[in-house]
């Protein structure tokens, strides 16, 4: 009998833990949750206190049987899943499904996979925390209710196959609202005035000192007036202020700050960060990666202090304790940090090394001294103007934590850090000569679109979601195609520059590319329509405060302050009638439909909406005698901004370009974009070609290329058996026959195969598949023997087929 069985949720974690425990311990993995709510059913008994109906998925049944057998043979079962709510729920499900006995079961938790942490956990077991289990169960059931009840409403009112989620819908709303802010944004111009002054340096050489007018000028006239004044002006230093500044390091990483910084510094997606962090944790290299705590243990603080002192000296050491700001921080009780602070580098994949380096530096920096900076501000008066120029300089007196780490910022976060530069020696009352003064037209910028990192930060600010939900939320909204992560090309813009050199002012216009964006989250038309529909009919679900308050209630359940069923009852009592009323309500038009105007040719209504395969333009209505005409909206267009003229252009397709081989060549638009069609052959139009301007010659070239590709695909046909064909596929040549595919062995030349040889291959492979389906789960020795015979027979038949083909 096995003395001890330890069950964790991942095989990698099991492998690491097994190293630390002796021969009396066996470590197995549950591979995550072993049961869940039924996939295709509601699985919640609302009338019986929201009792959930769980099932063991088919792919987990064999594993559960194995775990049961192992648990029955063990004296003690140690449930060692993660220490957050999901981990506690996994432990509870294992306890229930494996029918474990309380006297033989121990629950252990640890936030790092080190020998010391594991042994300490075994010395200090606890019971399963049912409050944490209830909090996880409440979230799971509430999200199932929202998803199962809202989805049919969307199918009926918007478009089939749509789905909605509680946190995901709020994330989409943030992205939709930001997009509308951008479209509504009115750019304002102003003039930024900069001057280059010539100043003697310590060694007597003349150096340049850049200065900027204290505030921007609104118009070109104001800018020109100032430059005119500067022609005859004298410039004097009216004030010099020098003040010491201290820069303090950021706190160690939480889940969200790690996701944000990894995106900025390493270019990782949120999901990628979590995947790599999971591997580091399971390898025993970092602490648990789902946490909203910034706290470090005394052990970690002392280890950091020792590492800093050894590497940089005692002056760089400054012990700090950071307070966790997140209310109800409930995941793990320590920040993300290396398990061994003395290990500045690790082995592993490039991604693992990069992320570990980021975590190590951030943790070390958090326990280092402030950076000491001296900032100097120089005010330069203009003799005949009230305006002043300002020059700033910064000298780092002691680099402190900056020696190791500098925090990055999103493009929508303004930082107060000036460009660090050293000013020459200056004194109050000193006269200055300028080399040139420039007034450059600048424009206000619209709010930037969200990146994955900035969306996580916004969700955290609003109190929506928790460390375990950020990555799945962002992945889900992209998988459902409510949001896409894409690029926006910049636009050319003209700006004006006035330049004073000596006594002459030049006036020139320049061009620049502005507004280019990469890896930004943008709503799709479907995402916008679903968002607007949910806001109209289910305002609570989309309300930021409501969603945040639900998260707080989950925290209260976890702390044992609230009953999970009471919270669900309150929610369902209001939510369910809204669903019923919305399903029953009759609306004048389909959700998301936008009427653009009237078609001048037919006099019928022109509108855009979300169709079965995406956004479409429509001429006419269902009430008209003639059926409405539809045209697919181009990918670069939006039903929010498309004009009547642009919509009417879409109906110019299909258009006939001319003839090729006696048949019409037609350009049209379909579900997957524009295409060329001729005599049953279809060729996709490349993105570089416009369907409205493509020529007959260009179309014929595309058709010829498609014909060549098709010819290479079709290797051989047989007149006497038209249903059988030899084709060239992605994984090599194969036989297609009566709706099924049959692989051709590698040692056979497909072109040499006769019809008889093909049919023999089909028969042998069909017989083999039939034999497979008849086999039981337990493979006996006789079955294995018969398999060998079949494989030999197949080889013999294919050899025979080849020789038959060659004889012909």
What are these regions (language model features)?
Residues 2-5, 16, 25, 151, ...:
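Basic, low-complexity terminal or inter-domain segments flanking catalytic cores
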Residues 53, 81-83, 100-106, 125-133, ...:
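Short, polar/flexible loop-turn hinges at active-site or ligand-entry regions and domain interfaces
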